[in-house]
C-alpha cells in the first residue's frame, strides 16, 4: 500500500530525486536504474524542470507533485489518498486531481476527503463515515456518480448528489 497524505512528508535535506526514491535510499537499494525511474516519474508529474531546486524552493503544489511521484515509485496496488489536495489553490487542486486520476487509473485508490465536489469528481463509489449510533453502521449508503471520472461539475445530477452528500454529512453531525 502507498500513502499520499494531506501534508507532504518530503524530507527537506534530501534532493527531489531522493525523496521520490526514498524507499530505495532507506534500504540501500538506490541505483542508476532507480534514479532514472524517479526522473521519469518526476517528468510524468511535471517536475522535470525543477530537479535542481531545493525543498524550500518548491510551492505547495510542486511538493504534492513530488509526493505523488514517490507514491508512483512504490508501485503499490492499493493507494490511500488522505486529503492530498486540500491545501492547494483551486487551479493546482484541479490540475493535481486530474493528474493523480490519470496516473493512478490502474490502481485501487481510497480517497479520503471532506470535499463533496472532489469526491463527486473523482470517485466511482462514495461512502460517508460518521460516528456510529447504537444499531447503526458507521458507513452511509453508497453513492455512485454517473459517468466517467474525472467528471465536469456542470452536470445537473452532480449538484443533486452534492446536496445528498451534504445532507449525509449533516445527519452524521446530529
Predicted features by range, described:
Residues 15-25, 35:
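Short helical segment in ABC ATPase nucleotide-binding domains corresponding to the A-loop/adjacent helical element
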Residues 53, 74:
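Conserved signature/switch motifs of ABC ATPase nucleotide-binding domains
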Residues 54-58, 62:
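Conserved ABC ATPase signature
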Amino acid at each position: 500500500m502507498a500513502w499520499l497524505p494531506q501534508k507532504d512528508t518530503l524530507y527537506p535535506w534530501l534532493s527531489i530525486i531522493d525523496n521520490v526514491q526514498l524507499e530505495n535510499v532507506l534500504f540501500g537499494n538506490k541505483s542508476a536504474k532507480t534514479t532514472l525511474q524517479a526522473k521519469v516519474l518526476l517528468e510524468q508529474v511535471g517536475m522535470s524542470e525543477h530537479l535542481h531546486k531545493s525543498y524550500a524552493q518548491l510551492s505547495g503544489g510542486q511538493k504534492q507533485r513530488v509526493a505523488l511521484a514517490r507514491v508512483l515509485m512504490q508501485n503499490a496496488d492499493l493507494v490511500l489518498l488522505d486529503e492530498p489536495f486540500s491545501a492547494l489553490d483551486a487551479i493546482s487542486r484541479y490540475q493535481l486531481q486530474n493528474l493523480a486520476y490519470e496516473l493512478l487509473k490502474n490502481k485501487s485508490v481510497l480517497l479520503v476527503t471532506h470535499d463533496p465536489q472532489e469526491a463527486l469528481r473523482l470517485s466511482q463509489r462514495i461512502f460517508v463515515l460518521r460516528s456510529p449510533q447504537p444499531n447503526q453502521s458507521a458507513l452511509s449508503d453508497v453513492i455512485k456518480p454517473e459517468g466517467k471520472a474525472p467528471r465536469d461539475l456542470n452536470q445537473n445530477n452532480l449538484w443533486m448528489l452534492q446536496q445528498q452528500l451534504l445532507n449525509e454529512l449533516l445527519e452524521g453531525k446530529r
